[in-house]
């Protein structure tokens, strides 16, 4: 049975999440509330919410966990040319936290293969907007000719970034935002981006799965670090074009 959490009930251990033999592997708990304080506590424990309209708030901690190590980010030859163009042409901009709510709404409206509707409900937007106002959630946005054409958002505590969703209204626009995020996190020695669940797209960019135990142990250490700044200059992306992945960083987490 999945426990029901009252307003003052703590999360159970992530080891109590449902296993692969269940119909919902990784499901840990359910609740009626999505208070910012509950959300913050969840992320610091390696837990995230994922549910649809009409459902209670469902809390997850899957095993294995999909991550992206910034040092392992893969850039194809074609995308390398795209990034060079973004750096060269002033009509391309990468902005941070310029339109957080707009990015969330665009992610909610983006069509997803095999998915009807969206899990980014009005309640989710309100909760993450509260985290954004507190400085704990951020958007990375791709702008072209003064128009926002792609982006992503996520949660950041200490030296840990938890990715949530992305969208694109122009070719490679979400990937450009991800590259900018990776460059920013590498510059500030962030070793891991939480990607939650495995997708072929994330795997093609260097994402991989690690054991939940390894993930949670890293989160515990990383969120205790001082927060990183969120001021951004797109020239930091140039570092991705001339630096090979660090073997030390790449080997830091068990496969």
From Swiss-Prot:
UniProt GO BP: protein catabolic process
Keyword Acyltransferase: yes
Cross-referenced SUPFAM superfamilies: Acyl-CoA N-acyltransferases (Nat)
InterPro entries per record: Acyl_CoA_acyltransferase, Leu/Phe-tRNA_Trfase, Leu/Phe-tRNA_Trfase_C, Leu/Phe-tRNA_Trfase_N
GO cellular component: cytoplasm
Keyword list, A-Z: Acyltransferase, Cytoplasm, Transferase
UniProt EC number: 2.3.2.6
Reaction(s) this enzyme catalyzes, per UniProt: N-terminal L-lysyl-[protein] + L-leucyl-tRNA(Leu) = N-terminal L-leucyl-L-lysyl-[protein] + tRNA(Leu) + H(+); N-terminal L-arginyl-[protein] + L-leucyl-tRNA(Leu) = N-terminal L-leucyl-L-arginyl-[protein] + tRNA(Leu) + H(+); L-phenylalanyl-tRNA(Phe) + an N-terminal L-alpha-aminoacyl-[protein] = an N-terminal L-phenylalanyl-L-alpha-aminoacyl-[protein] + tRNA(Phe)
Compartments in which it is found: Cytoplasm
GO molecular function, one term: leucyl-tRNA--protein transferase activity
Family recorded in the similarity comment: Belongs to the L/F-transferase family.
Function field: Functions in the N-end rule pathway of protein degradation where it conjugates Leu, Phe and, less efficiently, Met from aminoacyl-tRNAs to the N-termini of proteins containing an N-terminal arginine or lysine.
UniProt cross-references to PANTHER family, sorted A to Z: LEUCYL/PHENYLALANYL-TRNA--PROTEIN TRANSFERASE (PTHR30098), LEUCYL_PHENYLALANYL-TRNA--PROTEIN TRANSFERASE (PTHR30098:SF2)
Listed name of the protein: Leucyl/phenylalanyl-tRNA--protein transferase
Species name: Burkholderia pseudomallei (strain 668)
Name of the coding gene: aat
């Amino acid at each position: 049975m999945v426990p029901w959490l009252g307003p003052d009930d703590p999360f159970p251990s992530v080891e109590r999440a449902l296993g692969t033999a269940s119909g919902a592997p990784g499901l840990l708990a359910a609740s009626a509330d999505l208070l910012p304080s509950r959300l913050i506590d969840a992320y610091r424990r390696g837990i995230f919410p994922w549910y649809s309209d009409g459902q209670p708030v469902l809390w997850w901690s899957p095993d294995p966990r999909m991550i992206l190590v910034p040092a392992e980010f893969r850039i194809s030859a074609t995308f390398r040319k795209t990034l060079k163009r973004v750096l060269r042409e002033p009509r391309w901009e990468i902005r941070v936290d310029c339109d957080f709510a707009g990015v969330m709404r665009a992610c909610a409206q983006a069509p997803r293969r095999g998915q009807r509707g969206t899990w980014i409900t009005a309640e989710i937007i309100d909760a993450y907007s509260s985290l954004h106002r507190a400085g704990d959630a951020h958007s990375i946005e791709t702008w072209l000719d003064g128009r926002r054409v792609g982006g992503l958002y996520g949660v950041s505590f200490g030296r840990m970034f938890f990715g949530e969703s992305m969208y694109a209204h122009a070719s490679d626009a979400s990937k450009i935002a991800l590259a900018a995020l990776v460059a920013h996190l590498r510059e500030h020695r962030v070793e891991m981006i939480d990607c939650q669940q495995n997708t072929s797209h994330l795997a093609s960019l260097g994402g991989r799965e690690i054991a939940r135990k390894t993930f949670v142990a890293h989160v515990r250490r990383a969120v205790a670090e001082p927060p990183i700044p969120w001021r951004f200059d797109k020239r930091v992306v140039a570092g991705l074009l001339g630096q090979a992945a660090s073997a030390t960083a790449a080997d830091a987490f068990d496969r």
